[in-house]
From Swiss-Prot:
<feature type="region of interest" description="Disordered">
    <location>
        <begin position="346"/>
        <end position="370"/>
    </location>
</feature>
<dbReference type="GO" id="GO:1990456">
    <property type="term" value="P:mitochondrion-endoplasmic reticulum membrane tethering"/>
</dbReference>
<keyword id="KW-0813">Transport</keyword>
<feature type="compositionally biased region" description="Basic and acidic residues">
    <location>
        <begin position="96"/>
        <end position="109"/>
    </location>
</feature>
<dbReference type="InterPro" id="IPR019411">
    <property type="entry name" value="MMM1_dom"/>
</dbReference>
<protein>
    <recommendedName>
        <fullName>Mitochondrial distribution and morphology protein 12</fullName>
    </recommendedName>
</protein>
<keyword id="KW-0445">Lipid transport</keyword>
<feature type="region of interest" description="Disordered">
    <location>
        <begin position="185"/>
        <end position="264"/>
    </location>
</feature>
<feature type="region of interest" description="Disordered">
    <location>
        <begin position="88"/>
        <end position="147"/>
    </location>
</feature>
<dbReference type="GO" id="GO:0045040">
    <property type="term" value="P:protein insertion into mitochondrial outer membrane"/>
</dbReference>
<dbReference type="Pfam" id="PF10296">
    <property type="entry name" value="MMM1"/>
</dbReference>
<comment type="function">
    <text>Component of the ERMES/MDM complex, which serves as a molecular tether to connect the endoplasmic reticulum (ER) and mitochondria. Components of this complex are involved in the control of mitochondrial shape and protein biogenesis, and function in nonvesicular lipid trafficking between the ER and mitochondria. Mdm12 is required for the interaction of the ER-resident membrane protein mmm1 and the outer mitochondrial membrane-resident beta-barrel protein mdm10.</text>
</comment>
<dbReference type="GO" id="GO:0015914">
    <property type="term" value="P:phospholipid transport"/>
</dbReference>
<comment type="similarity">
    <text>Belongs to the MDM12 family.</text>
</comment>
<dbReference type="GO" id="GO:0032865">
    <property type="term" value="C:ERMES complex"/>
</dbReference>
<feature type="compositionally biased region" description="Low complexity">
    <location>
        <begin position="216"/>
        <end position="236"/>
    </location>
</feature>
<keyword id="KW-0446">Lipid-binding</keyword>
Length: 426
């Protein structure tokens, strides 16, 4: 189904002039971000005009809008989600920090009963984390052990438990001393004074090698793994409430999944949302006026700059346009040649031309659009400020034209070809 566009009404009047000025300003800003070659000093975009020739549109499909069109704006949504996460994060840390300041031998410590020997049933590390399940693992990252490739699976637990349990109360020391967990947590080697030191500010010294941490009577006993990690502070200092290392609070576990705010928030689909896919062919007189300054290197580098005026007087275009209506938004973009062929198939006229006039030496599946892009042709005129005998005296004019046209193509491809798109509020 073909439709006719009232081009004059759509591109004239105050709204048409405002849209043309926005397009001119947009292209001008893009040129200011381009790295210019040595022989060009600046590129300025002065005017843009839609011309008088309308495009030829042929509707190919009505369908549901692409999922990318339902993504919320990152600037607005990310800030809201970040504030929620920061608030929840702060409340959880405040609660955990206050709980950890309590003595480790208080009666209110929540533990899963009954406690089991971690070496039963194939030594699964998950039951060992039961005394610390109320803690967020974000604040207690797992750490590898130097000298052991890949680390060990239970090091993180032993490091965490040192801040809240002392001496043989730690699972490692209890197992090494032959005390089963089912009989309770014993503390026959340390008195109440030592227990107090384990949860106070002096708990930071547990990262150092201390003879008290080793049970010399048992050959299977070993030093606390925290003493072997001087360059990576353990979680025991955080558990004890020691604030001398605030930077440790921001360490992340590499195994942790990404935070939710990194995923885009999607708008809700509605039955009235729709999308139109149409083939757009254009061979019109759209105009774009640019100026550039060419640098002359004689008799010295960048000796003088001469103005060069470039006028784009027409464009030949062939591609598939996508217009999606979602609530009060209209999203507009073009599809690349590969995406267009996959979604709506190749153009019938192009297929007939390919069958009637096969191109020797070329891949029969390669279309002209893939070779030249969506902009098939750009007509340009150049005006030089100085001429001699009707001939241009500047040698870099052709280079400047090719550079400017290449940038026009690049801006079009990057800004208007899906997944890039423009959104209009209506």
């Amino acid at each position: 189904m073909s439709i006719e566009v009232d081009w004059k009404t759509a591109t004239s009047g105050p709204d048409g002039e405002a849209l043309a000025e926005r397009i001119r300003s947009f292209i001008h800003d893009k040129f200011q971000q381009v790295a210019l070659p040595r022989f060009i000093r600046s590129v300025q975009v002065h005017s843009f005009d839609f011309g008088t020739v309308p495009p030829d549109l042929e509707i190919k499909d009505f369908c549901e809008p692409f999922a990318d069109f339902y993504e919320e704006d990152e600037d607005d949504e990310t800030s809201e989600v970040s504030e929620e996460l920061v608030s929840a994060h702060g409340n959880q840390w405040h609660r955990t920090h206050s709980e950890l300041n309590e003595p480790p031998y208080r009666d209110e410590v929540t533990m899963n009963q009954p406690l089991r020997d971690p070496f039963d049933e194939g030594f699964h590390p998950s039951p060992l984390r039961s005394p610390m399940e109320h803690l967020n693992p974000h604040f207690l990252p797992r750490a590898g052990t130097p000298g052991i490739p890949g680390g060990t699976s239970t090091i993180g637990y032993h490091l965490m438990s040192l801040g809240g349990l002392s001496g043989t109360q730690t699972p490692l020391a209890a197992v090494a001393g032959g005390t089963p967990f089912a009989n309770g947590w014993t503390d026959h080697n340390l008195g109440p004074g030592n227990r107090g030191h384990a949860s106070g500010p002096a708990a930071g010294a547990m990262r150092q090698h201390r003879p008290e941490d080793i049970d010399s009577s048992n050959p299977t006993s070993r030093p606390s793994t925290s003493s072997t990690l001087p360059s990576h502070p353990s979680g025991s200092n955080r558990n004890s409430g020691d604030g001398s290392h605030p930077e440790e609070e921001h360490l992340d576990d590499p195994a942790e999944p990404d935070h939710p705010f990194r995923f885009p928030k999607m708008r809700e689909r509605r039955p009235e949302d729709f999308q139109v896919m149409c083939r757009a062919k254009y061979a019109g007189d759209v105009r774009l006026s640019l100026t550039a300054e060419i640098l002359l290197d004689y008799p010295m580098p960048s000796f003088v700059g001469l103005p060069l005026k470039l006028n784009i007087t027409g464009v030949t275009f062939d591609g598939v346009a996508v217009v999606a209506y979602i609530r009060k938004r209209v999203n507009f973009c073009f599809l690349s040649a590969e995406d267009a062929d996959a979604l709506i198939g190749a153009d019938d006229q192009e297929t007939r031309d390919k069958d009637d006039h096969p191109r020797s030496g070329l891949d029969p599946t390669t279309s002209p659009k893939r070779q030249g892009g969506l902009l098939r042709e750009i007509r340009v005129e150049s005006e030089i400020g100085r001429k001699e005998d009707g001939k241009q005296v500047l040698k870099n004019v052709g280079k400047v034209e090719r550079f400017v046209l290449a940038q026009v193509r690049r801006i079009f491809e990057e800004e208007l070809v899906f997944p890039s798109f423009w959104t209009f509020l209506i």
